[in-house]
Each structure stands twice: as C-alpha cells, then as structure tokens.
C-alpha cells in the first residue's frame, strides 16, 4: 500500500524530469550540427607557420588544419576553399586539410625585388549542414635564408695616410653609409662585418691595419708606417654576413689601396752617403780642403772642398712641395777654437769662405764639425767632419834624395813589373822626391816627368816614394840599357833632373840556331881517323851561360863520327875505316847552358856519303820524280824546290829546264839547282806544269835528268758574278704570302767549294726569302699602304773559308688591291654646341682617308636616331644642325648626344670606317638666381667683432645643377647703401652675412644691406635682396659667467644622459636658450636648451678620441623665436671635456697559440718563451699581469711559471728523461696589474734534447746573430712551414763555432746556432733528419734571405748534427767491462733470492697448518649428520673478470687475518657449548671477541645501498646459523661469520672477483679432497639465515616443530640415495632436487661416517693458506657482500638456499622488481650458472611444512600469492608477465599453498644493487606468511665460470617483544638481543627436514637447467616502525659450510 502511494506520488515528478531531458537532448542535437567548420584545437584562431624562402614547390605548409567536419567521401559535411590567395602561392587539399606551397616556375624569395615576408590566406569552410561559413586565417611567415652574398658598392677603395699618423688612428671610413658592402638578406644574414684578410701579394698589410669595430668597417692604423720602407699597401677587406651558422656565412672581398704619404720624420743627410751594411745609416763623412798659407780671401774664396758640401732632406716626397723644409748649414764646433776668425759657411749654400789669411806657423790644420738642419722648426740635424789643411807657401823647389838611380829589369818581365834596385831583383827601385814646402812625412803631390822612353817606363803618380814600372816588354838582345832623366814639378817649381839608368837583365829567351837545317858532306875512303868532316856553328843571342852552346850527336853516327862539344867540329872517330857507298844521317843538337828548367836547344841533320878517292860517276838527282802543289797566289820569286844533284867527284854541276815551261813561268838556278817562281800563276788558265830538268858536270856522259810535276792549287780569287741578262725590276701583289717575285743567278770560276755560290738577302729578311736556286718569294703578306716598293739586296757568296761575295740590287714594286677601309683622322670627335643655335649651323668638319689607290670616300650618319637632328655632307664631311638644341630638354648630367658616322669607298668592297661623334650641348644660362626671400632680417650685438655671422641669405638658379650657370655666388651691393656695405659683408659661396669690421654701433639702429646673387653662366645673370640688420641692446644679449668651462672628466662608459656639466648665462629680462654651435660634429653630447645641462648623447670611446672642445652659445628666447642668432664675444663659451679612460678592452695576445720547447737538461727557472699581450686602454688598464693555467701534473709539480709582469715563461721542474713529452696550458693576461679584464692564449711546450736539434754554422759572429735572431727565426719558420704548416723553429742556443777534435775548439768569428722545430700537429719535435732536409734543401734561398741581416759575405756554412749526438752514438757502440760486471752481479743476486723466497713460503705454510690443528677438537664436537659428497670441479671454468676494488671494511680482514678470526669464533663456540651461563660468566674473557664484533659492525655501518646512506639508517645484514632444538650440538651452535663486505654502489655493476685469480686453481684441487658423502646434506643443513637491518613483520607466537628423529632418518636415506653422483660431474646433481643413482650411492656409502674427518680436513685446508675452495667458492669472502646486499634490497626475511654442489656465477646486478605473485616450476639444475648480463642465479629451498606462518599485518591489504599443495605439471605454465622467470622441472615440486603477502612498505627508491640476488622458495604451508617471498630456482648451465658469488640467505622475521623466547634458551654474547631465537632455529630446522622429504630422485641424464635472463618478481615488505635487529658480527673468516655459511 505504501509502495503504491509512493509510486503515484513520484509519477508527476518523473514525467516532468523526462520532459526536460527530452528538450535538452534535442537542443543538444541542434548545437552539434554547428560544430562543423570549427577548429578542433585550442589556442588562437589564426594558424601561423613558418617556411624558408626558396623552399621547393609542394612543400607542406600545414599538415592538418584541424577543422571539424569531413570534406571528402560520399557524404561531405564541409567544403573548404582558399580566399585572398594572392599570386596563388598556396594550394589546398580539402580532403586532407593540408596546405602546400605553389612555386611552380618561380621562387619564393624574401629578398628584393620580390620582398615576400609573409603570405596570408583565408581558408573558407562552408558547413553543408547548416550553411554557415567560417574563415580561418593562415599566416605563413617566410624565413630568411642566407642566399645572398654581401656586395661592395665599388670594386676597390683608396685612402691616403701620412707616415707620421699615430697608431690607433682611423685612416679610412669609406664603408659608412651606402659606400660599403650591402646584403639584401634580412636580420643577421644581412648584417655586414668587415675583416682584413691576409694578402699573399702584400703580406704585411694585415699586420699594419686592422678593423677593431667590424660592424663599421673603419680601418685603423695598427703599426707605425714608414714611407722609406713602403709607400703603398694593398689591404684585402672581406665583408661577411653574420649568419648564425658559421659554415653558412657568405663573404666577398675588395681591395683598399692605401698610399703612404711622406712625412717629416727624417732629417737632412750629407752627400755622398755610403750606407752602413744592413742599416739606413750613412758612414761618417769627412770633407777635405787645402789652402795655402798667407793667401788673401780674395785669392782663395770660395774654398774648394772635396767632395762639395751638400745635404738633402731624406723626406724627398713631402706634398705639397711648398711644405718641404729648407736646409741650413753651419759650423758647429772645431779645433783650434779660434776657427771662427778664419772660416765662415753660408747657411743656405754651404759655401766655405776664408775670412783672413792663415799663417801655417800657427795653424797647420783645422778640424771642423758642420751641421745641416731643417729650417721649419723641426731641425733633425745631421753632422759631418771638415778637415782643412794649411799648405806651406810654395817657395822651394822639389828635390830628389839621390843624385842618380840605377835599376834592373828582367827582359822577360811582364808589363806592369816594377824596376828593381838590385841585381837579384828582390827590392824595388825607390825614387823619393820631396818639397821643402811640405813636411817630409806628407805627400808633396809632385808630378814626375821622364824625358825619354815614356812608352817603355812610367812612374807611380802619388806618394812620397815613387816606383818605376814597365809599360811594354823589353828585349835585351835589342837594347841592353836605358838611360833617361826624371824631373819633379810641384806646379810652380821644378827640380833638378836626375839620371836613371835601367839595365835589362838577360833571360834565356833565345834558342841556339843552326844556319842550315841540314848539311850534305862527302868523305872519302882515303881519309884517316881524326880528319875533319864539317864545322858546325850554332848561334844564341843570349849572354853568359844562356849563350854558351854545347854540341852533341844524338843519333845516326853509328860510332864512326865524333863532335867537339865546344867547337862543333865533326871528325872521323878513331879506328874507323870508311867504306865506299856508306851514307850517314847525323842528328846534331846544339844546347845552351842555362839552368835545366830554362834550357833551350835545336837540331840539324848532317848527311855524309862515303866516296872513292877519284871521279867515276855523273851528277845524280836524289830522286827522279818530284811532285808539288803550288798555290796560284804564290808570290814571284818564291823558292819552290831545291833540285840539287850530287857528283861523287865533286865536279861543278850545271842545272837547266829542258822542257815543260814554254812561257818561262819558273826559274832554275844553273849553279844551285833551286827552282823558283818567275811569273804569277793563274789556275783558271793553266792548272798543271810538268818540267824536265837536267844536271850536268860538263862531261859528255855527265848529264842526268829529273821530272818535276807542279799542280797549281786554287785560291778564292774570284767573286761570284750575277747574270746581267736577268730582269732587275720586279713586282708583286700585296696581301699575298709566299708569292713568287723573281729569280737571280750568279757564277764563280773558282774550283771546288770556292766556286759554289750561296744566295742570301742583304735586307728585308722578314719580308722576303730566297731559295738555293735564286728564286725570291714573299715571306709575309705585303701591305702597299705601308710601303709601295722595296730595294732588295741579294748577296751571292762562294763557299770558301774566307768567302768572297757580290751583291745585286733588285727594285720590287708592290701592286695595290682594295684591302683598306677608309679611316677617320680621329676615332672620336667631341664638339661643344651652344644651345639655341639656328638650324643649318655647321659645327664640325670630319675627314676620313683611304690609303688604297683611286679610292673615292663618301660620308653618312650611321645612327638613325639622330638623323633628324644633324646632317652630314656626303663629300665634304661637314656636320650641321637640322634643328635648334635645348640644354634643359636633356636629363640631368646628360646634356650630350653621341652617334656614329661612317666613311666608305664608293667603288670599293671593304667595309666602311666608323667614328664616334659626341655633341655636348652647352648651357647658355637661361635663368637668373632667385632669392628665397626678398627681405631678410638679422640681429647683431653693438660690439660684435669682425667676422660675426648675422644671418644667411639663399638663392637658387633654375639652370641645370652642376653647370656654371647654376652656381650661385653672392656679393654686397655697395652702391645703394654704401655705409652698411662698409661694415657688413656676405660670404661669396655660403651667403652668410657677417660683420666686416668690429662694430661700435648704437643699439636699436637698423641697417639695410643689399645682397646680389649672380651665377657663372654666359651671360652672367643676377638678382638682389635686402637684409635688415637690427643692433640689439647689450642687456638683451646673454653673457656667460665664464669664458671657458672645464667639467670633471667623463668616463667613456658613461651612459646616455649622464650629466657632464652645467653652463649658465645671464641677460636682462630675457629667457635664455642654450645650444652647441661647434665641436659636436659627432653628436656625442647634448645640451638642455633651458637649464644649460650638458649630457652624454651617444657612447664615448677614449681610444677613438680623448677630449672634446665644445663651443656653446646662449641666445635670448626672442632671438630664437625669430629663427635668428646673435653671436657675440659674450654669449659664446668653450667647454673642455676630457674623456676618462675605462677598462673596456680586454688584453689581446700577439698570438693565439705559442709554441716553445724546453731541453731535457734545462735547469730550474730556465727561460722558455716570452708571451706578450697588448691592451688598447691606457695607464694601469694596459699594464698586464700574466698567469698560467696548467692541467694537473704528476707529483703535484707546477711544470712552468710565468713572470707576472714580463710574460716570460720559465721552467718550474726538471725534465730529465721526458723527451717527446709535451705540455699544453693556457696563459692568462689580466690588465690593471691582474685586477681587470683578461685574455688568454694557448701555449705548447715540447720537451726535446739534442737528438732533435741541428746546428746552423754561419761565418758571422754570435753577437750579430743574437741581435738579428728574431728576423732570422722568422725566415727559418717560413721554410719549415712550407713542409709542415704551423711548425715553429725554436732557438736553443747561440754560441761560438765549435770545431776540432770532439768540438773542443771555439771560433768567435763564426757562430753555432742550435735550433729545433716543433710540429703543432704532433706537439713534438720534428725529426732531426727531417729538419735537416727542410733546411739544407733550401740553403741557397735561406742564405739569400739572411744576406740583409748577415751583411756582405755573411752566409750559412753548413748544417750539422750537435756534438752530443755524435758522442752518444760512439758511447753506445760498445759495452764496457763495468756494465757487464754489474749485470752479472744482478743475475747472481736474483738466483740467490729464489731459494730464500721458497723457504719463507714453506715456513708460512707450516705455520698455517699448526693453526688449523687448534680447531680440530671443536670441529669434532660440532659434527653433524653425514652430508652428501660435493660435486666435482668444473672441467673448464671461465676466466675470471678483473677484480674490483675491495669493499669498505675489508681492512679488518687484512688486519686480523683469517686464522685470528677463525680462532675467535672457535673460542666463542666452546664457550657456548659449556651451558647457558657460559657467556655471562665469562664475559670478561671474551672482551676481545666482543670488541671485534663491535668494530666489525661499526665498519659496516657506513655502507649504503643507493647513494650515501643516512647515518640513522645503516643496512648491514646479520647472518646466523640455526639448527633444531633437539640437536644438542646445534642448540649451542655459535655464530661463526657472515662474510659481508660492504660495497659502494658505484661499483655495483662489477661483481667481486677478489682473490679469484690467485686462489681459484689451488682451491679447486683442495676441494676435491674435501668432498665426502655427507658434504651435500651437511651444507644444506647448515644454511645460514640472513637478517637485514630493517624493521620486520611480527614473528609467530610460537614455533612449529617436527620430529627430529624422523627427519634425521629421512635425511640420511636421501643422503644415501644421492651418493650416486659421480665425482667428475660436479654441478650435475642437486641435493635438494635430484637423487643419485644406486651405483654411486653404494660406491660412496662408506663415507657417511667421515663427516668429522672431512670437516677437520676442511678446516686444515682453510687454515693452511686457502681461504676459499672451489666447492665453497660461492660462499667466498669476495662474493658474500654482493649477495647479502642483494637480499637486503630485494626481499623480505626469507630462507634462500643454494645447493653446495652447484657452482652458481652471479650475473651483474639488476634493480629489484616488486611483484605480487609468482608461480614457478622447478627442474633439476646442472648447477653451473650462466654469466649473461643482467641475470641472477639462485635456488629455492622450501620451508618445512610444519612451520606456522606468522600472523599477517592487520591494517595493510596484500595481494595473495597462490601456491599449490600438489605437484606442478611438467608443462610450463602460462607465460608470466615481463621480468618473471619460469622454471620447468622434470620432477614434481613440493606442494605449496597460497600465501598472501603483506603489502609493500613505503621504501626509499631502490638503488642499483651491487650484485645479483637470490630468492628462496616460500615454505609449503597453507597459513599465510608475512616473512617470506618466493622466487624460482635458477636454471644453471655447465658453461658458467666460477660461482664464487652465489650464496644462500635466510631472513627470518624479527620477533615481537611481547611474545618472548623460550625460557631454557638465553642468547649469549652478541646474540643476546635476538628475540625468539629458538623459534627461528626450529623453523629453519623443520624447513630443511621438509626439503629432504620432498626431493624425490631424478634421472641424472635429465639434469640440465638453463639460467634465465630475468629475475622473477618479488615482494619487499618493510616497516619503519618495527624495531631493528641488533648488530651482529659480520665475520670475515671463511669457515666450512658444515658450521656456518653466510652471505
């Protein structure tokens, strides 16, 4: 009932609400239709995009307009189009709503002339649903690209600068305004910077000038100029834009030509000037003069000075010439001091005059110093010496010191030899002539004359002692003596002559000569020995021994004849019998008796024939046939042949020519038989003669004959003769090359080559040529117009050695053709024509000539555009006007007409000649000047001074500007108003009206002045205007209180508006207006025209200008309002403003990069190099302080230091054995003595030694080289840099040249320059040999460049290796006995040390064994159930990674030692085993152990997990070992160790490998002996529990226990079954997950009871030197910190185990990941972990099933983790989420239950863990647990390396204090603060029992696992509010795992 009532009651309200909803929904539907065409984005309505200019066509402008609606498809809702699309730059894709650039056929250019900066279009959107239209604006901004280079307005620029211009002066401002470079780009791309570039053709230009302000381009002088060095510079100036990307900047260059003007910087220079080498200085000059004594001035003036005194100004080109200074001469000082009495020098001409006669008795000489200086007030004097000698009066005659002279000369003496005064010719003949007028010690300057033999002898012209010399050779044989007289003459007096007798000494210059060459002698058989045969006589013209002759028979005598050596008589030898018919030919030699070296000789032949004693034979010719050749040029009478016959009886013989000479050409002597030439021969008529000659002794039968055959040889006695019948007048056509002209022919009657004729041309060889047959051709094209005929000389020459020739002249006429165009007399005609001349006026006559013959020239105008203005007569060439010209009708500056005219040959074929005619229209002054006003007004003070401006008139002329008719000038009309014209004037050019005189007029007076303006046109036109000038009252003119104002200096950094000073003026009842009228051309200052405050108007620059002088003026307001000024003396003042320099320029180093070197043997503080920085500021702002910034150098050495104020860098360390090292650092220069701005430069210093050096040996002194070293080094740099760019030559030393043995000698006249070179690319010295090649190869060029610095003759002699290098090589060639002995001794010492080292090692090992014995008893008592055997060592472990640095706290292990740590824990174990009260009672005895625990805990407190850990939150882990309560041994099990080395997080990516390389091999061997059948279970039993230092969840109220006996039985059974694992298969089985086969179990069953012994062996092994074993290497000290930290970071308290037989290698760490659940499957691992990066290897040991889980934390929700209580299937589960690892095991796993975990706590961000983490399997229980999480076991592969970093951790929860611990157990010592310790131990024991029960056996062949790449998830819980566990000892000693294993 109630329900019906409620429904009916609410129904109306529901209907109302429904209605409202329907209405609103309908309204919403309508609004939705209007959404189309709106923008789907927020922001401004306009779409703005940017695009680069010159973008390619189709560039996307807008990729999506984001307009709502659909424009395409079958049902479009909107329609899009473009509006306002100017020039159609934009295209629209309406479907995609995209905009594109449309630049087809054009370029989008932002620059002129297009100037498209932006494009604006409207996108029109039409809503098709409702019809609305919306416009969307799209603005496209065109971005500028740097696509244009700067352009200079002019191709080149020009500037002049005086050489005296100071450095820093701006010398060129020609780039200001539009005169510089422009760039049409925008923004920085269009801004111009100017820089000076290096000009290779003028290398000094960029150093001489600079552009400090690159934006202005003003060129500033950087270095001082010297006109005498260089007169012109070519400066290359580069203009570049300022594009942001330096690589995109564009540049252009221009050349600025700077001419240096000569300035007055050099003074006069005396002439002649002999320069000092390598300088511009003249050598000291001394002028000479000599005057006779007692002569009057009239006789001597002007005094002759040698050379004439003359000085010139060294500045020879000062412009204008009128500015060149004159030279004034004067005598500065002199000796004797009374020289002014006698001499005077003209100041302008330097003429020296004598003032009064000089007496030589008082003054023998004058030494004066003369001065020449400029007359312009800038003297710059020059000095010279003047020596005046006073000559004695010539009243004495010269005389000779000897009355006569005897001389000797060798006849063989050469010309120029000196006559000797002794026979041995050793001393010259001295002829001394003196004059008593001259001192005996001075040259009297006499003239000596010879009266004879002047062509043979001469006397030297000067000197006191004269010598005779030979002018031509003498011959003693011709003349033996010469006698002549010598006279001396002094110009006035003559001496008495003396006789000189010269005797010519003989020389062996003649050879003994026989009269005949041969002699014929007959001897008879009846002659007896000793009889004379012939008397030979030779003649020698020499005298003495040179003329004595000795005779000797050389050959032919056969011993039958002898000769007398003295007389030359040939006689028959003794005992010789002559035989008829024998003949002899004796060779006889005649020799003189001169010395053997000079001896001469000749020979003759004596023919001897033996005859019978009576006459029995006729005469007989020597031969029957004679043949000879006779030249036809032989002279008449020449002897041709000797036809002498012999008659045995000696009868007289008669000779005759019997036949062959009818013309009697030859003569034969009848008596002698000599045949001679009787007449001249002519070969051309008779060329051979055969003569028959006879010889008769008078008897009838006494006649014999002989034949003479004479051949006449030719001589060149005939010249070639031209054929006279060939034509000699020839012709040839012009302009034809190789044209035949004609032919000549010549013959020669001579024979052979003498008759061969050769032709040549005597002239015009370049125009004609002639062939060997005489044909003549043209060599080039002839031009008749140049020359119409030629007279060609043809030369015919025969072929003789001395040829004869003849010539023939040919007349050649050149025939004309039409080959020339008419040529105007001028190529350009320029004529001035007045405007307005009438038509028909002739104004020019042009003329053209055609050089061709018969040409008829006609003229016409070629340019058709002027034919209506001008007419040209076709024949006369007269040019006239067709219409009048008007100057004003032409454009400005173009009142001229230029056109072409041509001249052509009417009958010719050549093109016409062309000329240019320029008609300049002259303006004829059409308009007069017109004033801007008719009446001007002005005001003036009554006392205005002369030149005071009053007002300015202005007139304009309408004539074209720039012409004389438009130039307006002004003058005063003095006719209308004469008095005003007398006191006022107008400036002719400016029109400014000024006062002509100083005024003194009455106030209020008004003057009228008529000013006339006139032009310079023709005729002159003018106009006039009136100026009314009012004289003001003095009180109306303001007066300044001061004439000069000097405000305080203004800082150059003063901002605009900074007040400089205040000026003030006063006037009666006047408002004053101030203004600056002069001195402010740069607009640097402004003035408040009311207050007079002067302020800074624009930036100042002290370096540009240091002061300003402003002229300010004060005027009354009335005057100003009248636009007038009234200047006067009182209303103007000067303001002197000084600019104060500020430190606004940083220092700039001369170089950006300095290169230097230092030798290895350099001493401390040796100078390296000097740096220098300059500053444009002044004062202290330019005073530098230098410092160095040097990178750290080993051992904390500084390396280098710099002198603070000099910039000299010095060494600050020694560089021994540091060759090839280098240092790079920076040098900082700070101005203001280190307090101001700074600049920096880089410095490179390379360490070298003499192995890098070369010595340059020069023949100049070291002092000269040292002075010029900078210039010389620059030259060497240039040549080295040709090979290695940027290289620097460094000078090591400059010294005297060293030479000799071992370079022990020094020569200071020569220099050794030791250098080396640094390569900036390698920063090291260039190889010595390479440096030698660079320099030696250019030695000639270097010497040429060194010449100006070395001087004449200076050069480099050689380039050699330093002496130290040579000595080092010598010392290194052999090894001395001392070195060998030292090496042998060192070898012996090493051999002796090896046994000692071995003894120490053995002793140390025995000591370790004894320490291990101490632990045996404890190990026996702590024996536990038998463990399974350990797995064998892997066959091939991977190489270990490099060890990281040891963790913090590791030093404790090193200090205590492993044995000490072990003993401490054993002692603690025994104390625990004594009972519950053992620890408290014996606390004192264990103080050491507690102290160790405390120190160890404290050492771990600083360790951190992620970044530095706060002191209040330390996180060291606690590791305890627990066993079940029922086990009496485990109940009192002590804490042994937890090997946790804290590591810094910065090394967490590198796993610990400490000691691995040293101990791994040894520990692997030992581990095999330690393995036993109980080892595996023993390790599992004794897995440690790790408590991290964090607040835990609450522990359960009571522990759950299991039956210990049942658990032990099960454990032992599993152990026996697992013994089947073969020892060699280490890692192939797991004690928790797999079982051994039966065979292996039986095989090792006997080892079950050997646990104690094995434990003892293990302890022994550990204590005897091996802290690690391969079986337990994963529990080693080096790996434990990583695992422990991983558990701290990544897990809640849990139990994690790792089987003892598994060798797990921890992978690099990963950041922990927190997951909520995990389902895992287990499989039997092969127990070798993979070492892939970012992987973890671990195993899960389940908790015993009987352990109760702790209660969950009530307030925190937690997602459950489901665990199954039944075995998991073999197939893998569903794919886990990322970062999870799934394990597939072939065997069933223990049942698990779902364990809800507590929610995660609020933890700090997890850091990168230092090592991988292992996570345990959660306990198999159905009760939720809060103290554990689960993680799958690791899949291990057999390829892993040493698993030293794999451990197991167990983290039990902390106990709640309210639960308490069991009463019968009280923790002792360090465990006293652990809560609920018994429950924890029991839980752990039950867990291990559960492990044994739930590990069924597995097939060994299937035992293979793989370590996954990712960790499974984990859940980390932490509660900040829980109390922390007490610190426990974190042990360092590595104990056997049977007692305690820690992570």
Curated annotation (Swiss-Prot):
Here the disulfide bonds are 37-125
Which stretches does UniProt call biased (Basic and acidic residues)?
Answer: 1480-1489, 1498-1509
**What spans does the record annotate as topological domain Extracellular, numbered to this chain?**
27-1381
Q: Where in the cell is it found?
A: Cell membrane
Q: Name one GO molecular function term.
A: calcium ion binding
Compositional bias of kind Low complexity: 1784-1795, 1822-1834
Instruction: Tell me the impact of changing residue 139 to G.
Output: Impaired interaction with CDH23
Q: Which residues form the signal peptide?
A: 1-26
Coarse class of the protein's main subcellular location? membrane
Membrane topology note = Single-pass membrane protein
Expression across tissues is:
Expressed in brain and sensory epithelium of the developing inner ear. Expressed in the retina, in the photoreceptor inner segments, the outer plexiform layer, the inner nuclei layer and the ganglion cell layer and, more diffusely in the inner plexiform layer (at protein level). Not detected in the retinal pigment epithelium (at protein level). Expressed in the spleen, dorsal root ganglion, dorsal aspect of neural tube, floor plate and ependymal cells adjacent to the neural canal.
- Give glycosylation sites per the record: 57, 102, 206, 424, 564, 667, 729, 773, 826, 856, 1069, 1089, 1180
Task: Cite a single Pfam family from the UniProt record.
Answer: ECD
Biological processes, Gene Ontology terms: actin filament bundle assembly; actin filament organization; adult walking behavior; auditory receptor cell stereocilium organization; detection of mechanical stimulus involved in equilibrioception; detection of mechanical stimulus involved in sensory perception of sound; homophilic cell adhesion via plasma membrane adhesion molecules; inner ear auditory receptor cell differentiation
Segments on the Cytoplasmic face: 1403-1943
Give me the ranges of the annotated region Disordered: 1425-1453, 1475-1533, 1714-1865
Q: Which UniProt keywords apply?
A: Calcium, Cell adhesion, Cell membrane, Deafness, Disulfide bond, Glycoprotein, Hearing, Membrane, Repeat, Secreted, Signal, Transmembrane, Transmembrane helix
Function of the molecule: Calcium-dependent cell-adhesion protein. Required for inner ear neuroepithelial cell elaboration and cochlear function. Probably involved in the maintenance of normal retinal function.
Q: What is known of its domains?
A: Cadherin repeats 1 and 2 mediate calcium-dependent heterophilic interaction with CDH23. Three calcium ions are usually bound at the interface of each cadherin domain and rigidify the connections, imparting a strong curvature to the full-length ectodomain.
Quote the protein name from its UniProt record.
Answer: Protocadherin-15
Q: What organism does the UniProt record list as the source?
A: Mus musculus (Mouse)
